[in-house]
Structure formats: C-alpha cells, structure tokens
Amino acid sequence: MSALAELKEQLRVVPPPQRAKALEKAREITRKKPWVPNPGPQTDAYFCLADVLLYGGEAGGGKSQLAIGIGVNEADRGIIFRRELTQTDGIEADGKSIIGKTAGFNGTDHEWTWFNGKSLKLGAMQGVDDWIPHAGRERDYMAFDEAGEFLEVQVASIGAWLRAPPGKRTRMVLPSNPPRSADGLW
C-alpha cells in the first residue's frame, strides 16, 4: 500500500473537524512547493528515502516530471541529464512551466538559477567520455532521464561528484523505460 493510500485510509476514520484541519495543513504545505507529485507511485518515489532511485513506467507516466520536481523542490545544485542535449527540450518546456518566473533560465547554459543561488541544469552525455566535462562540479542532485539509454560507466563516473555539505541530502534519480540497446543493460 502506498503512503498516500495509507493516509487516505487513516483520514477516513478521523472526525470531520480534524480531517478538515489535516487537509488544510496539507494544502498549506503543498502551496509552498512549485511542484507536487501525482498520487500513487510518483508520490511514493518522491518521498522514497533511497539515495539512488530507479523509477520506471510507461510513456507519459510522470518520470521526467519526477526528475524536474525533485530538482526544483529539493536540490540546491542539481542537474538532469539526457543522452543528447537536443532531447532536453521537453524537460526544458516542463521546467519553465513549473518554475515560471521564480528563477532565471540561461538558454546558452541550459540552467535555471534562483535568487538564493540554487540552480538546476540540463546536461547531456552522448559519448562514453562525455561525463568528463561535468566532473569536478559537486551537485546534491543528479537525474538521468531515460537512464536505460546511458552507459553504466557514465553514471558511475559522474556519480562521484554527487556530494553535499553535512546535513544536506544527496539523491540520484534514474527515471527509465526498459533499455532499447545492450548499452543500458546494467
């Protein structure tokens, strides 16, 4: 049973005045978030405590949205990779829709920057060694959208820079469909 299903079940037996209070509290909390996960698996993935999360599903199932949402809500310095930079156009459009005017977007660097210094970048790693230009840049969040398209060496190598100050959570999210070639069979 998902966390949301459990919560719904528990709320069913709560007296109406307390239930209304709990729902208002939930609305208040989510009002402060630019992005809120869909009920079900996406919510379970969002709140999952795993440091590295593989999130699969069918086309249109919210995998890329999850990558953006975690980056927007939780990361201080994040990056979302696709195998080719031209494949980030959908992520860029969705990100602009979610983020709006709360952050500036630099189209040359493919990066949003907030007034408080927080950033979320779109990147690519097509060739086996294309992780190298990203090396040395510590990030507290990395997502590999369509993870089954990446080489294991790319993810493992750049993952060494998934770091944060003490007390700050780091996350790697791997939204993916099944791999289309042997490259993704890791």
For the regions a language model picked out, list residue spans one by one:
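Phosphate/NTP-binding elements of NTP-utilizing enzymes
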Residues: 2-186
